[in-house]
Amino acid sequence: MSEKMYPIPFKSLMNWIVTEYAREGEIFGVHTPYYATGKTLPIFGETIETPFGPAAGPNSQLAQNIIAAYFAGARFFEVKTVQKMDGEELARCVPRPCILAADEGYNQEWSTELEVPQAQNEYIKAWCALKVLSKVYGLGSPDGFVFNMSCLLYTSDA
């Protein structure tokens, strides 16, 4: 994954998906789609078709990565919490690389690589795409996945 993340416009994203699926039978390099079996599990008042999915991280900030995970069978998406300091401002405050593993892992990660409105747009694009793809390609129920996001509350110091 590149150090800099570049969101893809929704129309381009959907055109890429439709073209790749028609030509190769895959989406974003995922060769074998997961087709839901009809079994579901309850979670947070919703249902999911499988009990796994990507953990929050840079990987879950771009719509195409969420879509690829869904196509492979993920149905629980822990989307990354965003905060006031974001994007370039936050990147300047955290030393690089943020993960050092010379002999034991140490992770010093910031909360968001995208700016808050960009991250929001990515989650909305992914959510809409999954609703469509689940139906069009028969991958599962449009209500068979969950986006889980923790809340970050702000208080005024004034």
Where are each of the predicted segments found?
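Metallocofactor- and cofactor-centric catalytic cores in central/energy metabolism, strongly enriched
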Residues: 75
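N-terminal, Lys/Arg-enriched amphipathic/low-complexity engagement segments
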Residues: 1-38
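Short, acidic/polar
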Residues: 61-68
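Conserved, mostly hydrophobic/aromatic
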Residues: 54
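A gly/proline- and charged-residue-enriched helix-loop-helix capping module
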Residues: 91-146
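Conserved small/polar residues in nucleotide/adenosyl-binding loops
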Residues: 154-158
